Amino acid sequence: AQGGERVLITVGVHGNEQCGLVAVNQLAAEGFFEQLWAEDSKLSELTLMIGNPGAVKANARFVDVNLNRIFVDEAKVRSGGDSYEESLTPALAEAIDQSTWYLDLHSTSAPTPCFCIPASASSIAVSESLPVQYVLEELLCSLEGTTLHWASRDAGRVAVCVECGQHLEPESV
């Protein structure tokens, strides 16, 4: 892709958190993503990625280990590992590294208002423009091992985790 923003949206990093997958499928069915390619668009690439397909298929948080806690050691992330989730980290890390904007969609097991967590100070303005009830800026530096923490290594990247509300509640999608 030439110039423009390279956007990555991940869903299903935790397999039992499927509201993001449902929402992305609904948006695709409604033609939303085609609208992003207007002539004046600053978007050059959009990647939609299921973070943990095996866990999504099993409707389980994870298969072997929590994928959203193992993005710590760069060498291990880049080479993968023995567990199912560790085998996913090289491709997911590469996709994050290639993006200029990263949106990671999650949901919660308990009733929760929609909120987001920006990965860096440069992501706060974007977070505040999203249709969420609040932004948790206090968690900027406390999420080690997550895909959001991995994304924050590039201070210029806009990266936000959105917790959409309770799993599969209609208002969460």
Task: Give each language-model segment a name.
Residues 1-173:
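Structured catalytic-domain cores with a bias toward divalent-metal coordination
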